[in-house]
Amino acid sequence: MAHKTLLGSSTSHDSCLDLWREKNDQLVRQAKVAQNLSLSLRRQQLVQDVLEGLRGLLHSLQGLPATVSVLPLELTVICNFITLRASLAQGFTEDLAPDIQRGLERVLETQEQQEARLEHRLRGLWDSVLHVSSLLPELLPALHHLAGLQAALWLSTDRLEDLTLLLQTLNGSESSASEELLLLLKTWRPPVETSDAPLTLQDARSLRDVLLTAFAYRQGLRELITGSLPRALSSLHEAASGLCPRPVLVQVYTALATCLRKMGKPQRALLYLVEAVKGESIWGPPLLEASRLYQQLGNTAAEIESLELLVEALSVTHIPEAPQLLIEVELLLPPPDPASPLHCGTQSQAKYLLASRCLQTRRVEDAAEHYLDLLALLLDGSEPKFSPPPCPPGPCVPEVFLEAAVALIQAGRAQDALTVCEELLSRTSSLLPKRPRLWEDARKGTKESPHCSPWISAIYLLQGQAWVQLGAQKEAVSEFSRCLELLFQVTPKDKEPGPASSCEHGCTSDVVLQQLRAAALISRGLEWVAGGQDNKALQDFLLSVQVCPGNQDASFHLLQTLRRLDRRDEAIAFWQRLEAQTDLPQENATWSLPLYLETYLDWIRPPDREALLEEFRTSLL
């Protein structure tokens, strides 16, 4: 009776309901007109008008006591309002939860279950509402639609347990196994809306299909990262067979290729990558995965070409398309994770991968040019702040400079290498300590990086090698000596347990320090040899063996010098000790040194140590 008083009469009630429904339908049609417009101020204004119209309509409906006859429309308006808000925000956030909660509370108001509203949170409200929904079959289509939006919110916020329980209730399932979530989504059958139902921006079944694809992809990616490859393959196949827009399909195909590559099936992986790169747009993730696949297959030319295409793809500015005014798979995917195999990073990170792989594969001219391009990107500020490529761990910016100098020296461009070294030196020399410091103490300084001394030492080392290439022995020896002077100012101290920084490449700083000392001593020793000063060379080679025990390169250079000086007895004794060492694993062989240092050590390594040992065996004994 009170309801009739508020509405005037049953006739006026029906008239208001018709007006409200017509208003909802008009707003939905208006949104679909806006959807067909390109990105423009007119589209933006039209969509905003629809959003405000839905907000006002919802305010009118919820300003009256809840009634079963009006609730299907009210719940539909809530669904349209949430759908439009989420699509405009390009994602689901917790601030949508109050709209869902208010809709559930309105259902319970019709059953006079106020205590359920007060005592339960959102999960409890759903239990209560779905329990009474059997008494209100006319509400089921709208409730399932609202449940789909709740599922989207919980999927986006990783509340998978709540999502599982909700779907079990919707399906009438008794199982509580969380791993059945994919099956629960597949078996969920939202009721079909009647032909005279209020219009919706997106129906419940379409939303269910989006949820199924998004969850399958999220689960497959998670399983891929954790190493559950067969399960990942199954989940990703499910995602690929679902409602998958082209950008998402590219990611799914790339993830499938990654999974198959890790399972040792490169040819099948390649088929998915071919599908991923079809079409007009160039996508970064499949190109990065292609480079990994070709590297695994030993096809260096194809690997480098893939990285070149990746750099090109990341340099293109993509014009964003107008977002759909409905819930799409992209809205339910997690934000880009640097640890993900699908993360291809920035243009500078891709350029670094290309440059470093050229350096590692002896494509020295290409490496030099790519490093110079990379330095230009980093120095002109056109790129976001450079950070190491996530997989494998990449270098800090100073190490990029050092690798660039190494590449230039290897390409015979010593003068350019000196210029790069001078640029890096101007940026780091002010951070050097003014007095000798313990390595561990240097780490605790607030201004100086713990890697600063090795970086500057490496600059002097590379400058020395550049002068060697230019035939300036005096300058070369001077730079090697400056390198050693700085290195011996820093005293290694036992490193406490803890994770290595990205600059250390899984190698302790003390090992880098040790190898730098050996490299500088060997390099200066080789210059003494070139100048006919074998006695000075002997001192440096002997010291290099002492500072880096187990370094076979230093030992071979020392042995050759002893033989040239005709110190036969010492040479025989040392050769016997060295021959015994060759049967043992070389010390520090399991550590991965920074690329610039690995490359440098290759330069000063005797070309054929086994042949040298055999020569010593026949000549000394």
Model feature map: region roles:
Residues 1-621:
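Non-TPR docking regions that flank or precede TPR/alpha-solenoid scaffolds in eukaryotic proteins
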